[in-house]
Regions:
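Cys/His-coordinated zinc-binding microdomains
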Residues: 91, 140, 160-163
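Short cysteine-rich clusters marking metal-coordination/redox-active sites
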Residues: 87, 136-139
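N-terminal secretory signal peptides and thylakoid transit peptides that target proteins
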Residues: 1-15
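Mid-length scaffold segments of soluble, non-membrane domains
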Residues: 78-109
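C-terminal segment of N-terminal export signals and the immediately downstream linker at the start
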Residues: 22-62, 70
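Short, non-ligating residues that shape and space the ligands of small metal-coordination modules
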Residues: 96-97, 145-146, 168
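N-terminal post-signal-peptidase region of extra-cytosolic proteins
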Residues: 64-80
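Residues immediately within or flanking Cys/His clusters that coordinate Zn2+
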Residues: 84, 133, 156
Length: 174
C-alpha cells in the first residue's frame, strides 16, 4: 500500500466513523430535549381500548388505523425551533428539528430519523401503489411514509403525519 492509498483509506474510515455517529450526535446536542436513541428499544404493547383512552380520535385513526391527516393542517409544519419530535403514543424520540425541511407537501418532512433503530419500515401496498411505511419501533404507531425524493445528504423524505408526533423544545441553559 502506498502513502496516497494509506491516507485516502484513513480519511474514508474517519468520515464513515463520523457519519455513523451523526444521529447520536444530533440527539446528544439537543440538551434537555428527550432522546432515547442510544437505549435498547423496549416494546410498548396496549389493547385498542387502552390506545383509545390515551389518544384523541384523530391520533388513534392515524397511528393505530394507518390513516392520514389532511395536508397543511398540522401545527408541526410551522415549528422551526431546536428540539425533538417524539411519537405521540409512546414518546420515543423520532426526528431532530435539525433534519426537518420544507417539502411543500403539507406534512412535516425530515431527511433522516434521529436514530435508524427508532423507526421501522414496512412495504405498504395500499392505494394501488407500493410505498414504504414508517412506524414507531417501540409501539408500532403508523407515522407516515418515506420516499426517495428528499434533499442531501440522504436523498430521503420522511413524510410524517404531524398528529402522530409531538414536539419537545430544547431547553436553554442559563
Amino acid at each position: 500500500m502506498n502513502r496516497r492509498s494509506f491516507i485516502s483509506s484513513g480519511i474514508a474510515l474517519g468520515a464513515f466513523a463520523a457519519l455513523s455517529r451523526l444521529p447520536i450526535a444530533f440527539a446528544s446536542s439537543l440538551g434537555d430535549a428527550r432522546s432515547e436513541q442510544a437505549a435498547p428499544i423496549k416494546k410498548v404493547v396496549k389493547t385498542d381500548e387502552e390506545w383509545k383512552r390515551i389518544l384523541t380520535p384523530e391520533q388513534y385513526n392515524v397511528t393505530r388505523q394507518k390513516g392520514t391527516e389532511a395536508p397543511y393542517t398540522s401545527p408541526l409544519n410551522n415549528i422551526h425551533e431546536e428540539g425533538v419530535f417524539e411519537c405521540v403514543s409512546c414518546e420515543l424520540a423520532l426526528f431532530s428539528s435539525r433534519t426537518k425541511f420544507e417539502s411543500h407537501t403539507g406534512w412535516p418532512s425530515f431527511w433522516s430519523p434521529i436514530a435508524k433503530q427508532n423507526v421501522r419500515e414496512e412495504v405498504d401496498n395500499s392505494l394501488g401503489e407500493t410505498r414504504t411505511e414508517v412506524l414507531c419501533a417501540r409501539c408500532d404507531a403508523h407515522l407516515g411514509h418515506v420516499f426517495n425524493d428528499g434533499p442531501k445528504p440522504t436523498g430521503l423524505r420522511y413524510c410524517m403525519n404531524g398528529v402522530a408526533m409531538k414536539f419537545v423544545k430544547k431547553q436553554k441553559h442559563s
